[in-house]
Amino acid sequence: VSLRRLLFLGLGHLSNGDVSIAADFARQLAPDRFAVGFVTPAATAPYVQATGLAAYPLESRDPAHNLEAFDRLVADFRPDLLVAADAFTLDYSAAWSGLSMSLLRQRYDIALASFDQYDYPAADYLVDFYGGHRTRFPRLLDLCDLQIRNSPLNRPAPGEPGVIVTRMVCGGSSPLPVSRRRQDRPTVFLTNSRWEYVNVVRSPAMTQLMRAIPRIIHNHLAALNRPLRVVHVGPARWEFPVAPRIDYRYAPRLAPAEFHARLAGADLFVTGNAVSVTLTQAVLAGVPSLLLDNHKLLDVALLARNGSAPAWLTQAAPQLTIAYPFRVYPWGWHDFLTPVLSDNPYVDCFLSAGVFERRRVLRAMTELLDDATVRARLAERQAALLHRLHRLPPAGDALDAAKLAGR
């Protein structure tokens, strides 16, 4: 039987999230049945190679040169299927990569697929950004012969025709422990990506939020009033004084295996991103996790004028005057993600609290660190989710059933 040949395109500059989901899928494909390659920006190639996959970086800043290089690669690699790690990210890359979804569709007689992390059709491609700005994205997934939805972010259930739903493996799964593994100071894991520092709608309110949330998370952790170790991986370290009982360890980046080991060894993972790939890794690895989001408009300036603003909030984030709903810090996506997260067993496998609701946040952090009953309940939900994930077909079988290669 000849190998099926898949060429993945992960062309984002601001995050490894899209590429990590595609790489997770690709690593599940048996090498005696599938040949796999990844087209990436030059800076992303080492990340892909560290996962054990072949990378073909586009080295030029000139889109014409990159298109020529891709033409040569297609001729040499002879793919049966081109797979966008994210169709929208691929289109954004056109200015430097020379590639777009419509170009791939028109230029090559090769089946075309894309991952759909967020179920864009269910949201009718309408994306709401922090502060209320809404954009209808182009229906790029309609160009595809196949859509691939990663679970558990997408519900672990079979997809409609033209859609496959496959489970993420990440670094593997472990049961969530009912009690903490160690008796010394707990380790809290935090991570950020470069896109979290991009004000995508040039909104003053988003700028305020970008400055406020790291300080607010630090303030919540300090208010636990106990020794903690905070491991923070991301492009920028905290730029404010750290509370004396917090041992703050910062790294700009870690290799994928070390990143997963640090995450899996943590006692608590905290994120402001409901669709964080690291949150999926944490849930599968049995790491107690907390999502900090916001579901209501908070006029902090008005509360301050009335003397009713929480003292801790004005101390932690004095420049914050107003806060809007968000599920993904700092971009918003509150309404956009409602369909994919509704009736989804994944969201029951971690705790959520409104980031501005002090008592709820501190209670959730304390329960995740110390409360065996809460941890046992999460462990049961995680086990049930894993059972449903394992009932999904393996990636290779799902691709075979789609019967797309060599169309």
What feature does the model see in each segment?
Residues 7-28, 37-158:
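Active-site and donor-binding regions of nucleotide-sugar-utilizing enzymes
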Residues 2-14, 189-197:
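Nucleotide-activated donor-dependent transferases that construct or modify glycoconjugates
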Residues 66-69, 234-285, 289-290, 294-295:
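Donor nucleotide-activated moiety binding/catalytic core segment of transferases
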Residues 124, 132-196:
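A nucleotide-sugar donor-handling region in carbohydrate enzymes
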Residues 18-21, 25, 172-239:
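Conserved catalytic-core segment of nucleotide-activated headgroup transferases in glycan assembly
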Residues 277-376:
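Catalytic binding pocket for nucleotide-activated donors in carbohydrate/polymer assembly enzymes
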Residues 39-54, 116, 127-130, 212-256:
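Catalytic donor nucleotide-activated moiety binding site of glycosyltransferases and closely related
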Residues 357-373, 388-407:
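C-terminal alpha-helical cap of glycosyltransferases
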